[in-house]
A protein has these predicted regions:
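Small-residue helix-packing and pore-constriction motifs in hydrophobic alpha-helices
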Residues: 2-55, 65-73, 80-94, 100-132, ...
Length: 186
């Protein structure tokens, strides 16, 4: 009886491993549909994504999905895996999913006409906002997406927008409500 329980556990683990490998293969194929494979071959992207997964402890499928999302949001293929690495760091420090970190960073980059290489500085700004206010980067990522394009259009830089969120939330205004106030003011 003990052997059959152990066999069942081994079979379940094997099945889960096969599923993860299949999901990762699908995610890499998806990256290949948007990547500039002339600048970075798919094999190199795959190797870099696996390396980032190992370094960060995040699943390879999650890294591949985030890479697809980053490239789809206009991050150059050559910069995508590094950008995702920065996004993983923001996700860990800001209490959010990697996909949400990619989303908020690409929203800022696209709205302000910045580069993927600015992701580290932008992550620092978001973490500083979290530290100075009563908010998390997760809450900011859900609220800022509606405000960033307007702020950019009206010449309000990301530093001032972030400081506004920090000040409002520090004074007891919920992050979502702060976004509504800022959007109305703009």
């Amino acid at each position: 009886k003990k052997v059959s329980v152990a066999s069942a556990a081994s079979a379940a683990a094997l099945g889960a491993s096969v599923k993860l490998a299949s999901d990762y293969t699908d995610a890499v194929a998806k990256v290949g549909t948007v990547a500039d494979l002339q600048s970075v071959p798919l094999e190199k992207l795959r190797d870099d994504m696996l390396q980032l997964s190992t370094e960060t402890g995040r699943g390879a499928g999650e890294i591949a999905d985030a890479t697809y999302q980053a490239i789809s949001a206009s991050v150059d293929t050559a910069d995508a895996v590094s950008f995702v690495g920065t996004s993983v760091g923001l996700a860990k420090a800001g209490f959010l999913e990697t996909a949400d970190a990619v989303d908020v960073l690409t929203t800022i980059i696209n709205a302000y006409g910045l580069e993927a290489s600015d992701a580290g500085r932008l992550s620092d700004i978001l973490i500083q906002t979290q530290n100075d206010g009563k908010t998390t980067v997760n809450e900011l990522s859900q609220s800022m997406g509606q405000v960033i394009p307007l702020a950019s259009a009206y010449g309000v830089n990301i530093e001032n927008l972030a400081a506004s969120y920090a000040q409002l939330t520090k004074n007891g205004v919920a992050t979502a409500q702060a976004g509504t106030y800022l959007k109305s003011m703009l």
